[in-house]
From Swiss-Prot:
Subunit structure: The RNAP catalytic core consists of 2 alpha, 1 beta, 1 beta' and 1 omega subunit. When a sigma factor is associated with the core the holoenzyme is formed, which can initiate transcription.
Catalysed reactions, semicolon-separated: RNA(n) + a ribonucleoside 5'-triphosphate = RNA(n+1) + diphosphate
Pfam families: RNA_pol_Rpb2_1, RNA_pol_Rpb2_2, RNA_pol_Rpb2_3, RNA_pol_Rpb2_45, RNA_pol_Rpb2_6, RNA_pol_Rpb2_7
Name of the protein this chain belongs to: DNA-directed RNA polymerase subunit beta
Annotated function: DNA-dependent RNA polymerase catalyzes the transcription of DNA into RNA using the four ribonucleoside triphosphates as substrates.
Entry keyword annotation includes Calcium: no
GO cellular component, one term: DNA-directed RNA polymerase complex
Length: 1370
């Protein structure tokens, strides 16, 4: 693939050992795809599949009235255009949504006619509420803020078998249970109790013997026994009986009597164990029946009812034990054949038979009544109610739905194949088979299920969650419609009279606004956005809760491989419950996570890629991505490391079915951005992955010198950068927009051949960081589709750049880097390397109060002239003003209640209508501790209220900008069209034209240049077809002009109409402040390997350790932070970063060399750097100009990529270091022979340190834990109500907690007065603290400590236990 426009400018050298077989898929595909299927907006009505909105509608409609004479049918639905676009919704605080209209049909039947006849049909479109739309980057704008719907990992519907691990019963006996979980409907559980009786329960209610359920589905005791047991057949004789001999049932049993063959020879003596030889002898003797004594039958259980054939009298019932009297009665009635249940103690337990004994119901009706009584205790069981309840439990499609997934899981677990064939409700067979499998488990055959296996957990994505909410809304509507349908005929109602869209809107609004899975988007940087959208949570409605989730659920499971990242998960109570999707993972049609593998055909690894789910994967042997292959794609080694069904093993290549796609396939996006991840301890890698998401975008992003090669994918997929939608020529570039004239071959006929990209300028993100886009193309550049045109926050030339490359020295420095503290050079701060811009939004509203409206004005009494200077005539601050704490941003006055008026004054007021004369100043001021620059002001005015000048000027600006966009489009379209017309006209003969063009003359370029272009249309061509083309061109141009005018009008209408504001609000003004935050002590910083710390001191450059050539270190870290934490990746990163910088320096030296051979030398050096190891780069493709541009971009360091688990080896790092620092340079810089360490000098004394120091470049981040946001000082502030102690935290203006351990410290030093002060007057001694204040006022510095309030609370709590506790003062 050729390099794209931006890739050419700076090629990342990759150390990967293998080519990519498959590119990383689009990272937001899951979210976008899911919502697309939910809406199916672009799909034609006829082609819509039964999913999403369509499925919700079809499952509820048709709605039939109670009497069946009217029904409401669903025809189709359509989504309208949203009124405002995303940006406008964010500004106005609206939801980005489009109106949903459903076409429904009301059918009324004729009551007079006996057979159903349609009387009339009414069809109508009905508004069904607003459906939020997803933005192109996979988020939603709800009430003006961006939100993300996180996918949920929940237990898949289906049937699951498990046991209690011996925890229930004291003996440690395993109690097996089964559970049928539907997508929606009642849960059905089956469970054994310690006595081996099998029970069932519905929705965790009271348990009942399982045979009640079997009888309720129409089985008799005989059929139940026939289903679960094999029978032994006997024929009674006058003494004893003959028994059918089945050899396998006798093996290992004790003979209770002598067993003889036909000749009467004893083969097995009494009380001997029967073995295989005995059975062989019996079989060879041709024995089919053996005679057994009478007592052998006693205690056996009858399989069928025994009935006297003559009288029809029942002698014994099925499941009765055989006794002497039963046998006598049978002989008397001449019933000699009998069948008993075959059971044994080992693997044929009599469980169902025992259960049947405990069951007291007689027949199907009694069983159903028993179930009714359990479900609805206290209600009288009428026949209809009992019948209806039982049907609704598991057999009605309205109340019970297994879903396709559930049906597939039930089928596959019960051994009926892996497809979703069958009804979506439970069937009798399902229930029977489930019980059968459970009994087999108790008998010791089969395996229980692992509920943490990813084949038993599925992902519910946005679309599915939204569909469930929509359906819930529709169900509420259905109830209301049913009520009204009865009146539809008499009152001549239309469909829109029947349907009220409120419940639907409410359900949708509630889900998107306040569901646990709808979260405020984490927008700190592009990575945090992308990770948030790829997150998979086990929490939420229908999921787990933090408190109940055990260790197993949170643990890493073998099936997570390639599906869920084993590294990235939060620390703390949510660990393991919130996960991130792996890099290549995607969802299959059933919602299970699947991961790609390369298929192996005839021992060769092919390019065919198959996606396998966790269930499918268990059938195959899968090799790892780093297995060595030869040129043909065959395995080199005799034994290959593989995985099969979650176990790792070594096996011969012949047995291997699949191979991993890439080494990075097992980790998530954030983890795959950590270079040398394979050398880091997993706990630290987890911190590293999580902390990258908190990196604050710096003022000037800088690409990481050592990356992993996935930075570009992340930056582009996150939507932070601007990508070209179509290729073309850059026509115009400024800071706000990029205009591209599209290539002819990519332009669709009839469309405008212009793409205008408006860039986002200084916009506030959800986390108050700054989102700003900068163009990286120049006018006249040729770009292709997909090229990066502009960088966003934290991206550098289309690559993710979260931090800065810092020169790091690992050495202690006077205790300033003790315990993870960080020592930083002043130069870093002076160069604004870690300066970030944060944008604060301050809002003020003018309300209509009882005493009159509040007013936004400049006319405020007692305001200093310096304050007023910043406000314009409307009382709103100018853009660009620098403000600090307590400065007025918007002047506002509120009428204030008068003191009591005399009746005369009241009367005068009433007559002359004078409003309250007194007003108080309630202006918007800058909060304490904030300084910044005003960068934007937005004014929203209610409909019907006159706009002030400021609001009008803002609208005019906006319109001017829009007009300019339209003019640009028009200019390019017209130029393009006139170019074509010119080609058409030149050289053609004419019948006449402007400027007295004679008939028969030919048109020349010079002639056309003299005319105004619109006069060209007046030329009358003699050739008829060409004249038609000219006419069409004119019409198309005029039509375009008309379209642009319409668009402008539309925009103007939108801007000039009043804004929707909350009730009682007349005006709302938002002021945006840009706050510059420089790095300062107390800020948290971190590398990408979990090596975090807090800045302890910013040291002057001249005091920092420096190298022999005078280069000073930027950051000094403590070397003790590495060994115990086992994140050695940071050391390797430092070495490779050192090499990258050195190579860049060598290229810079070459560029300064102004000789002719310059390009040749640079080419040769670049070839050496890029193409000696790793996947290589195609330097030869580049022209000389491109090579020079590339070299200029590499001066500050050659970017390296060391992909996860496939990165640079030690030898490669050494080789790069040698390329970067030839002997003469190494000698000059006093590097050690390995080039990985250098001799440093103390900046303060100039002395050499006594041993060489590891030094190099690391990509270091500033995290979103800034001391400015955390530090505050409490004077007297709020106290907690009960304990009367100061509150904690900055928001509450709280104090510092003086806790248990701090008290111990004071006690240890015997500082009793300080201790007393801390625990009383500085905390919760109410009288004491007021007293101290008084004393200070009087100038008397004495403390009178009293009783702390918390002690009184303790006394009161003890009293609440009815213990009277009093203090005796002595």
């Amino acid at each position: 693939m050729p390099y794209s426009y931006t890739e050419k400018k700076r090629i990342r050298k990759s150390f990967a050992k293998r080519e990519d077989v498959q590119n990383v898929p689009f990272l937001l595909a899951t979210q976008l795809q899911s919502y697309l299927t939910f809406l199916q907006a672009e799909t034609a009505t006829a082609d819509r599949v039964n999913e999403g909105l369509q499925a919700a509608f079809t499952s509820i409609f048709p709605i039939v009235s109670h009497n069946g004479m009217a029904r409401l049918e669903f025809v189709s639905y359509a989504l309208g255009e949203p009124v405002f676009d995303v940006k406008e919704c964010q500004q106005r605080g609206l939801t980005y949504a489009s109106p949903l209209r459903a076409k429904v049909r009301l059918v009324l039947l004729d009551r007079e006619v006996s057979k159903p006849t349609i009387k009339e049909v009414k069809e109508q479109e009905v508004y069904m509420g607003e459906i939020p739309l997803m933005t192109t980057t996979g988020s939603f704008v709800i009430n003006g803020t961006e939100r993300v719907i996180v996918s949920q990992l929940h237990r898949s519907p289906g049937v699951f078998f498990e046991h209690d691990r011996g925890k229930t019963h004291s003996s440690g006996k395993l109690l097996f249970s089964a559970r049928v979980i539907p997508y929606r409907g009642s849960w059905l559980d089956f469970e054994f109790d310690p006595k081996d009786v099998l029970f069932f329960r519905v929705d965790r209610r009271r348990k009942m013997p399982v045979t009640i359920l079997l009888k309720a589905i129409g089985m008799t005791p005989e059929s139940i026994l026939a289903h679960f047991f094999d029978f032994d057949n006997f024929e009674l004789k006058s003494e004893g009986a003959m028994m059918e001999f089945v050899p396998e049932r006798w093996k290992g049993e004790m003979a209770r009597f002598d067993i003889t063959d036909r000749a009467g020879k004893v083969i097995v003596e009494k009380d001997k164990r029967i073995n295989a030889k005995h059975l062989r002898d019996l079989a060879n003797g041709g024995i089919q029946r053996i005679s057994v004594p009478e007592d052998f039958l006693y205690g056996r259980v009858l399989a069928k009812n025994v009935v006297d054939p003559d009288t029809g009298e029942v002698i014994a019932l099925a499941n009765d034990e055989i006794t002497e009297s039963v046998l006598d009665a049978m002989r008397a009635a001449k019933v000699l054949d009998l069948q008993t249940l075959y059971t044994n103690d080992l693997d044929r337990g009599p469980y169902i038979s025992q259960t049947l004994r405990t069951d007291e119901t007689v027949d199907q009706t009694a069983a159903r009544v028993a179930i009714y009584r359990m479900m609805r205790p206290g209600e009288p069981p009428t026949e209809e109610a009992v019948e209806a309840l039982f049907q609704r439990l598991f057999y009605s499609e309205e109340t019970y739905d297994l879903s396709r997934v559930g049906r597939m899981k039930v089928n596959s677990r019960l051994g009926r194949g892996d497809d979703a064939n069958g009804p979506m409700t439970l069937t009798d067979e399902d229930i029977l088979e489930t019980i059968k499998v459970l009994v087999e488990l108790r008998n010791g055959r089969g395996q229980i299920d692992d509920i943490d296996h990813l084949g038993n957990r599925r992902v519910r994505c946005v679309g599915e969650l939204a569909e469930n909410q929509f359906r819930a809304g529709l169900v509420r509507v259905e109830r209301a419609v049913k009520e009204r349908l009865g009146q539809a005929e008499t009152e001549n109602l239309m469909p829109h009279d029947l349907i009220n869209s409120k419940p639907i809107s409410a359900a949708i609004k509630e889900f998107f606004g306040s569901s646990q899975l709808s979260q405020f988007m984490d927008q700190t940087n592009p990575l945090s956005e992308i990770t948030h959208k790829r997150r998979v949570s086990a929490l939420g409605p229908g999921g787990l809760t933090r408190e109940r989730a055990g260790f197993e659920v949170r643990d890493v499971h073998p099936t997570h491989y390639g599906r869920v990242c084993p590294i990235e998960t939060p620390e703390g109570p949510n660990i393991g419950l919130i996960n991130s999707m792996a890099l290549y993972a995607r969802l299959n049609e059933y919602g299970f996570l699947e991961t790609p593998y390369r298929k192996i055909i005839d021992g060769r690894v092919s390019d065919q890629i198959d996606y396998l789910s966790a269930i499918e994967e268990s059938h195959y042997v899968i090799a790892q991505a780093n297995a060595a292959l030869d040129a043909e794609g065959r395995f080199v080694d005799d034994l290959v490391a593989c995985r099969e069904a979650g176990e790792t093993m070594l096996t011969s290549p012949v047995n291997v079915h699949y191979m991993d796609v890439a080494p990075s396939q097992i980790v998530s996006v954030a983890a795959s951005l950590i270079p040398f991840l394979e050398h880091d301890d997993a706990n630290r890698a987890l911190m590293g992955a999580n902390m990258q998401r908190q990196a604050v975008p710096c003022l000037r992003p800088e690409k990481p010198l050592v990356g992993t090669g996935i930075e570009r994918t992340v930056a582009v997929d996150s939507g932070t950068t601007v990508q070209a939608l179509r290729g073309g020529l850059v026509d115009h570039v400024d800071a706000e927009r990029v205009v591209i004239r599209v290539n002819d071959e990519e332009n669709v006929a009839g469309e405008v051949g212009v793409d205008i990209y408006n860039l986002i300028k200084y916009t506030r993100s959800n986390q108050n960081t700054n989102i700003n886009q900068r163009p990286i193309v120049k006018r006249g550049d040729r770009v292709a589709k997909g090229d990066v045109l502009a960088d966003g926050a934290s991206t550098d030339l289309g690559e993710l750049a979260l931090g800065q490359n810092m020169l790091i020295a690992f050495m202690p420095w006077n205790g300033y880097n003790f315990e993870d503290s960080i020592l930083i050079s002043e130069r870093v701060v002076a160069d604004d390397r870690y300066t970030s811009v944060h944008i604060e939004e301050l809002t003020v509203v003018a309300r209509d109060t009882k005493l009159g409206p509040e007013e936004i004005t400049r006319d405020i009494s007692n305001l200093a002239e310096t304050q007023l200077n910043r406000l314009d005539e409307s009382g709103i601050v100018y853009i660009g003003a620098e403000v600090s704490a307590d400065d007025v941003l918007v002047g506002k006055v509120t009428p204030k209640g008068e003191t009591q008026l005399t009746p005369e004054e009241k009367l005068l007021r009433a007559i002359f209508g004078e409003k309250a004369s007194d007003v108080k100043d309630t202006s918007l001021r800058v909060p304490s501790g904030m300084t910044g620059t005003v960068i934007d002001v937005q004014v929203f005015t209610r409909e019907g209220i006159v706009r002030d000048k400021r609001a009008q000027s803002i609208i005019d600006d906006e319109l001017r900008r829009y007009r300019q966009d339209l003019n640009d489009q028009l200019r390019i379209v017209e130029n393009d069209q006139f170019d074509r017309i010119e080609k058409l006209l030149v050289g053609k003969t004419v019948n006449g034209g402007p400027r007295k063009l004679a008939k028969g003359a030919t048109v020349t370029k010079a002639y056309l240049a003299d005319l105004d272009r619109w006069q060209w249309f007046d030329i009358r061509l003699s050739d008829e077809p060409h004249a038609v083309v000219l006419e069409q061109a004119k019409e198309s141009l005029e039509q375009k002009r008309h379209q642009f005018d319409l668009a402008f009008e539309e925009k103007r209408k939108k801007l000039t109409q009043g804004d929707e504001l909350p009730p009682g609000v007349l005006k709302m003004i938002k002021v945006y402040l840009a706050v510059k935050r420089r790095l300062q002590p107390g800020d948290k910083m971190a590398g990408r390997h979990g090596n975090k710390g807090v800045v302890s001191r910013i040291t002057p450059v001249e005091d920092m350790p420096h190298m022999a050539d005078g280069t000073t270190a930027d950051i000094v870290l403590n070397p003790l932070g590495v060994p115990s934490r086992m994140n050695v990746g940071q050391v390797l990163e430092v070495h490779l970063g050192w090499a990258a910088k050195g190579v860049g320096q060598r290229i810079a030296d070459m560029l300064q060399d102004e000789r002719t051979a310059q390009v040749k030398n640079i080419r040769a050096y670049l070839e050496k750097v890029y193409n000696t190891t790793g996947t290589g780069a195609r330097i030869s493709e580049l022209s000389d100009e491109e090579v020079i541009e590339l070299a200029n971009n590499l001066k500050r360091g050659v970017p390296f990529a060391t992909p996860v688990f496939d990165g640079a080896t030690e030898d490669e790092i050494t080789m790069m270091l040698e390329l970067a620092y030839p002997d003469d340079v190494a000698k000059r810089m006093q590097l050690t022979p390995s080039r990985a360490q250098a001799w440093l000098f103390d900046g303060r004394t100039g002395e050499k340190f006594e041993r060489p120091v590891t030094i190099g470049y690391m990509h270091y981040l500033k995290l979103h834990h800034l001391v400015d946001d955390k530090m505050h000082a409490r004077s007297t502030g709020p106290y907690s109500l009960v304990t009367q102690q100061p509150l904690g935290g900055k928001a509450q203006f709280g104090g510092q907690r003086f806790g248990e351990m701090e008290v111990w410290a004071l006690e240890a030093y015997g500082a009793s007065y300080t201790l007393q002060e801390m625990l009383t007057v500085k905390s919760d001694d109410i009288t004491g603290r007021t007293k101290v204040y008084e004393n200070i006022v009087k100038g008397d510095h004495v403390i009178d400590a009293g009783m702390p309030e918390s002690f009184n609370v303790l006394v009161k709590e003890i009293r609440s236990l009815a213990l009277d506790m009093d203090l005796e003062r002595n």
